[in-house]
A protein has these predicted regions:
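Canonical RRM/RBD RNA-binding surface and closely related RRM-like beta-sheet modules
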Residues: 1-78
Length: 80
């Protein structure tokens, strides 16, 4: 069963591909999406990643939550 994760405080330079590659180190990523402003198309600083299974999602949260990337500590947790 897949598990969806919220990813907050991501660098504004991140796009879908960078987000996916960041999480692929911890399991199979089904989808990765950086949320963007409808008008400007610029990153809003958060996104969502869907991992193939719960154990991969758990490993990703454990490894990446509060990890510093480009001077920002990202937030990773399971969506509710």
């Amino acid at each position: 069963m897949s598990t969806k994760l919220f990813v907050g405080s991501i660098p504004l330079s991140f796009n879908n591909e960078i987000l996916k590659k960041t999480f692929e180190k911890h399991g199979t990523v089904l989808t990765a999406r950086v949320m963007t402003d409808r008008t400007s198309k610029k990153s809003r600083g958060f996104g969502f990643v869907e991992m193939e299974n719960t154990s991969d999602a758990y490993e990703a949260v454990k490894a990446l939550n509060e990890l510093e990337i480009e001077g920002k500590s990202i937030v990773v947790n399971e969506t509710r």
